[in-house]
């Protein structure tokens, strides 16, 4: 009855009129984060210079084959001015969670959306990328044209975007769109 997906992909469904007009609800933002193998030293990535040094010191770096990984590969390394220096030690992980490969010891550092990193055992979540280097994926939902229960679908989306659902959404590594933003920067 509802679809929940990356906002850009949902826009395509809306354009094709496969969702009920006006039913789109912005739900959550998904930032990129980093993990290390459980028990490994936890590096500092809290600032842009610290992230840069961490990447330069690492023996191996993994990133996903999704949008977050494409960002790491095509933009993050370049923004940090280290794309040439990390090229040979940075690897795209296809079709499986990056954190699972870090947990096995195949890579020192792993980058993916935080919500994909947190549930994987055997790793330590280091943190999100610094704000200046962050890449956010927005998730949204809408009621489908073929919904058997469109009113219940609208109610579900309303609940998922409410303050009552915010703590559960936050626990998964997502940032609810309904959450207050820190504007003091």
State where each predicted segment sits:
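Exported/periplasmic ABC-transporter solute-binding proteins
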Residues: 1, 6-16, 20-21, 25-30, ...
